[in-house]
Regions:
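Short, flexible segments with low predicted structural confidence
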Residues: 52-53, 162-163, 238, 255
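Short, charge-rich amphipathic segments
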Residues: 23-43, 60, 100-104, 122-125, ...
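Juxtacatalytic substrate-recognition/specificity segment
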Residues: 44, 51, 58, 63-183, ...
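N-terminal low-structure segments adjacent to metalloprotease catalytic domains
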Residues: 1-74, 290-311
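Acidic/His/Gly-enriched intrinsically disordered linker/tail segments
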Residues: 132-157, 180-311
Length: 311
């Protein structure tokens, strides 16, 4: 049964070495009718980077800067969740969105928690979001939904728009900790894939979402770059040059891999060979088993044009 949800420092040296030398198990992602996935990608027990005492001290300092007494603070490892909705609602987001996403992402992709204790600020509406982002962080949000700020060690969300952006942004600090050299296309491709997600066979699963129509228009107009070009984009190129198409192409490449049982396998292959394959392009060719990537792009475009939003 498919369960859908709209969910728009010290470490002992030996343990550190074990994590740094770790290579992910290259088993494939599981979908109905495809190969099963191992219960966990990690070959060793995850290391607890921060202690209960670390979280307690963090929360004590955090409470000193709360904008008002109307905020609830919940420790949800590896994050601390802060929200100005009723306490039971904040706890619900913490358990059913944050914990769920963390558990599922770690199940298939990530062995390590983020490098720092990060705060997730869940503001109840656009007024609270804009006001408190300015008051707490000295900046006006560039998006009405939410964003991750590594500078402020925080995910800053307008939770009234739904939990999809929250799950998207949770991906980024995990990428930072586990795959620092990850190129923008995969970082944002994975993040945006899970903007609308649920579970299939107990694993996180992305569904077609609002990015689809724009990508389909770009395909029909012949404006989608080659996969070699997409994967080679640096941050400036990805975020500043035709940003919408880049996000859409990255998301639906990840979606295609997911639907063919190849996404987790690709991630682990790329992770294991990142020094020799900095863009992931060669790993992509290997996992697809395709030499002619121009022919694959045409096949992929036909596939994307058959998709419908919300299916």
């Amino acid at each position: 049964m498919i369960k859908r949800r709209q969910i728009l420092l010290l470490i002992p040296l030996a343990a550190w070495l074990a994590v740094s030398l770790f290579r992910l198990n290259p088993s494939a992602n599981a979908l109905s009718g495809s190969a099963s996935v191992d219960a966990t990608p990690a070959a060793l027990t995850p290391v607890e980077t921060f202690t209960d005492a670390d979280f307690t001290r963090h929360v004590e300092q955090l409470k000193k800067k709360l904008p008002s007494a109307g905020f609830t603070v919940v420790i949800q490892r590896p994050f601390v969740v802060i929200g100005d909705e009723p306490a039971d609602v904040v706890k619900g987001h913490s358990e059913h969105t944050v914990k769920w996403a963390v558990d599922k992402l770690k199940q298939d992709f990530f062995a390590k928690d983020p490098n720092e204790i990060l705060d997730i600020w869940l503001f109840k509406d656009s007024v609270s979001y804009e006001k408190n982002a300015q008051a707490l962080f000295g900046e006006r949000p560039a998006t009405p939904y939410g964003y991750y700020s590594s500078t402020h060690r925080a995910l800053i969300m307008n939770i009234s728009t739904g939990g999809g952006t929250l799950v998207h942004e949770i991906v980024h600090p995990f990428i930072e900790a586990n795959f620092p050299a990850c190129p923008p296309w995969l970082n944002e491709g994975l993040g945006s894939l899970y903007e609308q997600s649920g579970e299939v066979a107990g694993h996180i699963h992305g569904y077609p979402n609002w990015r689809l129509p724009g990508l389909q228009r770009a395909i029909k107009a012949g404006n989608v770059p080659s996969f070699k070009t997409l994967t080679a984009l640096d941050a400036s190129g990805f975020y500043n040059e035709d940003k919408g198409t880049n996000y859409g192409q990255a998301r639906y490449l990840c979606y295609y891999l997911q639907q063919h049982g190849l996404l987790v396998k690709f991630y682990r292959e790329f992770y294991a060979h990142q020094k020799a394959d900095r863009t992931g392009y060669q790993s992509l060719r290997k996992i697809l088993g395709i030499a002619d990537m121009n022919a694959f792009k045409k096949q992929w475009e036909k596939y994307v044009l058959t998709l419908t939003q919300g299916s």
